[in-house]
């Protein structure tokens, strides 16, 4: 229903609406949704891609990235995310950040250079970069 025009629109058969919202404490200037509004949605928790899926996505998006480099970067992402889940780190690593890092691989940077200059710079709280660096060295 459009309040301004007074026109009611009916949705077509088999039409569904999907919404995404970054409403948690980790997002700047976000607020909790009104409970009545939030109740209108079914919540779905999405997991990160598996390392194999994430490596495949990197190679699909950036065809010049070698499979071994994509696999290494995906494993590093898995370790850093796992550390965030265990509260050893306060910041996770998004798929977007991993893809951004993979773009540098395609430009000829090594995995180590990308990790040092792109990934580890996400960890700015005292001591977190050391924790992240120690995890990355395991790969």
PLM regions and their residue ranges:
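C-terminal regulatory/interaction module of P-loop NTP-utilizing enzymes
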Residues: 1-139
């Amino acid at each position: 229903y459009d309040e301004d025009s007074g026109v009611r629109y009916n949705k077509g058969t088999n039409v569904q609406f999907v919404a995404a919202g970054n409403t948690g404490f980790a997002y700047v200037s976000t607020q909790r949704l009104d409970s009545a509004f939030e109740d209108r949605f079914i919540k779905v928790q999405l997991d990160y891609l598996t390392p194999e899926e994430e490596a495949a996505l990197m190679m699909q998006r950036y065809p010049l990235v070698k499979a071994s480099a994509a696999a290494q970067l995906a494993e590093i992402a898995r370790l850093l995310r796992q550390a965030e889940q265990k509260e050893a780190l306060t910041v996770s690593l998004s798929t977007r950040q991993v893809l951004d890092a993979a773009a540098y691989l395609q430009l000829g940077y090594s995995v180590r250079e990308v990790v040092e200059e792109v990934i580890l710079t996400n960890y700015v709280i005292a001591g977190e970069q050391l924790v992240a660096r120690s995890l990355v060295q395991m790969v």
